A protein has these predicted regions:
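Structural motif corresponding to the early beta-alpha repeats
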Residues: 89-114
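Active-site gating/metal-coordination segments in enzymes
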Residues: 108-139, 191, 199-203
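N-terminal binding-site loop/beta-alpha segment at the start of enzyme catalytic domains
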Residues: 2-96, 133, 161
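Short, acidic/polar
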Residues: 47-59, 113-130, 178-183
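Generic structural signal for well-ordered alpha-helices
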Residues: 22, 56, 79, 83-86, ...
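Beta/alpha (TIM)-barrel catalytic core signal, keyed to glycine-rich beta->alpha loops juxtaposed to Asp/Glu
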Residues: 11-12, 143-237
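Conserved, mostly hydrophobic/aromatic
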Residues: 25, 37, 52, 67, ...
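Active-site mouth loops of central-metabolism enzymes
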Residues: 39-50, 105-120, 141-142, 146-147
Length: 237
């Protein structure tokens, strides 16, 4: 879910795309719905294919255009399930945004982290699981202290040049790490991250509101928030 999201108003149970607001993702030209559809925990573990498809279809009909996923969700099973659903629903590819994240791909050394090899392997695997030709958004799921940031920036730019991803970003990176990524990109004429995906809710505010303050101002990156309801705690769960 994007920060500052407002509720979608439903009128007479009909499709009401006009009630959904869309925001540019940072300084990019991509417009993302204020509400997004996530698949962490729920897909495979809690929802079967029929239930998941009903949820995705309902969200899409109400104007949600961003569907978020990751290689780590259900050990890739979440992307497999979403890919099956996308194929069945037959939405036009230019009407929705789909993402994946790279870091936790498996237990072996070459299946984890942000090395050039794993980034390329993870992207290709996500494309296959999701049954799409390209990813709109591709996130570094966490920072990797064992891989030079310049290697990660180069790997993401390779994928951009190949047309396998449209934008790349970070998730739960420190302001220092994001700044370094931009410094590397500027030095070697590469593209820096377009977005960051931090946790942000009333119980978790420090990083988003304070640590990232200068990052937002300096680099104008966008955000796609995870756990805006604190894993259900704020709903009274």
């Amino acid at each position: 879910m994007k920060s500052g999201a407002s509720p979608v108003i439903l009128l007479n149970g009909k499709n009401n795309h006009s009630n959904m607001n869309y925001r540019r993702l940072g300084n990019s030209g991509l417009k993302v719905s204020e509400l997004s559809f996530g698949s962490w925990v729920t897909f495979v573990n809690q929802l079967d294919e029929k239930s998941a498809m009903n949820c995705m279809s309902y969200a899409y009909d109400k104007g949600v255009n961003f569907f978020d996923n990751a290689e780590a969700y259900a050990s890739g099973g979440s992307e497999v399930l979403m890919g099956k659903i996308l194929k069945k629903l037959k939405w036009k590819r230019d009407t929705y945004i789909v993402s994946s994240k790279v870091f936790w791909g498996g237990e072996l050394p070459t299946q984890r982290g942000l090395s050039k090899k794993h980034i390329h392997d993870a992207c290709n695997a996500a494309l296959k699981r999701l049954k799409v030709d390209y990813l709109d958004l591709f996130f570094c799921h966490r920072p990797d202290p064992e891989t030079p940031i310049i290697e990660t920036v180069y790997a993401m730019n390779d994928l951009l040049q190949q047309g396998k991803i449209m934008y790349w970003g970070t998730s739960e990176w420190s302001a220092k790490e994001i700044n370094e990524a931009f410094s590397c990109a500027q030095k070697y004429n590469l593209r820096g991250p377009s977005m960051e995906q931090p946790q942000y809710n009333i119980l978790c505010r420090e990083r988003f509101e304070n640590e990232y303050k200068n990052i937002f101002k300096k680099h104008q990156i966008g955000t796609t928030i995870w756990s805006p309801l604190a894993s259900g705690i704020l709903t009274g769960k």
